[in-house]
Amino acid sequence: NKQGGGYGDSEIYMRGFDNTNVATMINGVPMNDMENGNLYWSNWAGLSDVTRIMQTQRGLGASKVSAPSVGGTINIITNGLEAKRGGAASYQIGSNGMSKTLFTVSSGMSKKGWAFTVLGARVQGDGNAQGLNYEGYNYFVNIAKRINDAHQLSFTAFGAPQKHFQRSSSSALTLANWSLVEKKYGVKNYRYNATYGVDANGKQYSEDYNVYHKPQISLNHQWLINSKSNLSTSAYLSIGRGYGYAGEANDADYSDVSYKTLRGANYGALNMTYRNADGTFDYAAIKANNAAGEYGSKVAMTKSLNYHTWYGLL
């Protein structure tokens, strides 16, 4: 389910429940945001390339996982000792300027019980609408040791630094408005983005822009106690660093330029305030207006930082 047409902005629904009510884990470590329960899949780009198995559980109940949830539970298990020896490299191209370069190498388990897997990839593209270009990297490293038949250790580190533009979900364009957009600008199937544009220097802007990197490091110990019992212990560390931009403006009652200026339509009519001939947002005019304003800027980009460090023992 794409949100705003942005890279990696997707959702998972299980039994009708959204991300906030579905516990998602990677190797048994919870991934949902601790404050609101959301899950940001752009932080885990490339995870499918190293996924060994996926475990799912519907609703609450007896479970081996650390965080059961009313909607259900998803546990993604990545490659480890089971990975076969070998390697691969690939280059993929797709629609909307998408390209992806990837390599992966696995040693397989040695006679002394060691194994490693390494993956690296880069993806870029223009997005499926105007001004939604993105760029991302992802990496994965796993080093595993089979100590004996009862014990094994696994060290895993992965992350996906990325930056991408989004199309605002609050553009206020109805189905009728989309038809008006095509007629107004004379472009059939116009993949319009109401807040996309450039300034006088050609720098790209959009109301929604995201930059983030949230690597995770974990150490897992598996102990097979007997044929009926086993104990899994994981220590993990996750460091999130990034930010997002959003457009802000004065209240409509106090300014000729308001937050509605950023929308694609107002009360059913296309918004023509600060628009270029092709419908893109005129950020050059906005900057000039702000500079000349007697009481400061009327429209501004806010930068919201999200810095956090998670760690735990399961």
Label every PLM stretch briefly.
Residues N19, S110-K112, R146-A150, N226-K228:
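Outer-membrane beta-barrel channels and translocator barrels
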Residues G4-G6, S66, G94-G97, G131-E135, ...:
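Short sequence motifs at beta-strands and strand-loop junctions characteristic
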